[in-house]
């Protein structure tokens, strides 16, 4: 299930991120890659744990917690602290086909996060760079994603995906993983579809008795399937 989440960050927040990044040193992105991913990863990354990375990560987390579409699509239990990467044309940067590690350990805590859902939050406008598409593969084929700054795509962590070579400009983004309360992707998609249907029904027929019964069904399913 791929879900586009628009306007996660405001233009002002995106601009603030870019200003902070402009005065921060970047490191080789392979520092956070697993063995398989490191062989195909060619990009730069903000160092984890720096004041700048923590400030921007906290901004993203606060925005996610205020976003009902993200909560509905992902049903977040634990969000890995957001990371930030950059792909430059002059370095012929790209990220070959790979699958994200199933488990990520939060640095300095020992906390392990199961990567049920992967997310990419775009911080560069499409007009700023050529190439750099995020290509996600599923049973229906390959989906190429290149969104406006401030918009985000979420997709199953089990997906094979890659980032094409940037041939002009720079592509800047935040990326992170979420452990969902519902680990099964099919059940999670069903819950999202049910929630969206309830919202549409309530908007069209707010007094319809099915709104209450379907809402009850949603929460009872969540009780059955959610992992504490």
Curated annotation (Swiss-Prot):
SMART domains: P4Hc. Its cofactor is Fe(2+); L-ascorbate. Coiled coil: none annotated. 2-oxoglutarate binds at residue 171. Gene3D superfamilies: q2cbj1_9rhob like domain, Rabenosyn, Rab binding domain. One of its GO terms (biological process) is intracellular iron ion homeostasis. Fe cation binds at residues 98, 100, 161. GO terms for molecular function: 2-oxoglutarate-dependent dioxygenase activity; iron ion binding; L-ascorbic acid binding. Binds 1 Fe(2+) ion per subunit. Keywords: Dioxygenase, Iron, Metal-binding, Oxidoreductase, Vitamin C. Residues 78-180 form the Fe2OG dioxygenase domain. NCBIfam families: PRK05467.1-2, PRK05467.1-3, PRK05467.1-4. This is PKHD-type hydroxylase Nham_3637. It comes from Nitrobacter hamburgensis (strain DSM 10229 / NCIMB 13809 / X14).
């Amino acid at each position: 299930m791929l879900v586009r989440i628009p306007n996660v960050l405001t233009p002002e927040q995106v601009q603030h991120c870019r200003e902070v990044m402009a005065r921060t040193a970047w490191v080789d992105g392979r520092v956070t890659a697993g063995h398989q991913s490191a062989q195909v990863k060619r990009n730069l990354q903000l160092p984890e744990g720096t004041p700048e990375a923590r400030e921007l990560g906290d901004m993203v987390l606060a925005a996610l917690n205020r976003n009902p579409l993200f909560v509905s699509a992902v049903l977040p239990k634990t969000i890995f602290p957001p990371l930030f990467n950059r792909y430059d044309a002059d370095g012929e940067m790209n990220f070959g086909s790979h699958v994200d590690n199933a488990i990520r350990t939060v640095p300095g805590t020992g906390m392990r996060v199961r990567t049920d859902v992967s997310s990419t939050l775009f911080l560069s406008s499409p007009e700023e760079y050529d190439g750099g598409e995020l290509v996600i593969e599923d049973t229906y084929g390959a989906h190429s994603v290149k969104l406006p700054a401030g918009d985000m795509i979420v997709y199953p962590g089990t997906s094979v995906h890659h980032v094409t070579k940037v041939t002009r400009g720079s592509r800047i983004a935040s990326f992170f993983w979420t452990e969902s309360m519902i680990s099964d992707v099919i059940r999670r998609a069903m819950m999202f579809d049910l929630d969206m249907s309830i919202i549409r029904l309530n908007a069209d027929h707010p007094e319809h008795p099915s709104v209450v019964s379907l809402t009850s069904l949603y929460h009872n399913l969540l009780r059955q399937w959610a992992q504490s």
